[in-house]
Amino acid sequence: TDPPIHIASLXRS
C-alpha cells in the first residue's frame, strides 16, 4: 500500500 518513494528518499538522505 505504501509507495516505495519514501524508501528511496531515505536512502538518498
From Swiss-Prot:
Glycosylated. It comes from the Eukaryota. One of its GO terms (molecular function) is amygdalin beta-glucosidase activity. Keywords: Glycoprotein, Glycosidase, Hydrolase. It catalyses: (R)-amygdalin + H2O = (R)-prunasin + D-glucose. Its EC number is 3.2.1.117. Monomer. This is Amygdalin beta-glucosidase II'. It comes from Prunus serotina (Black cherry).
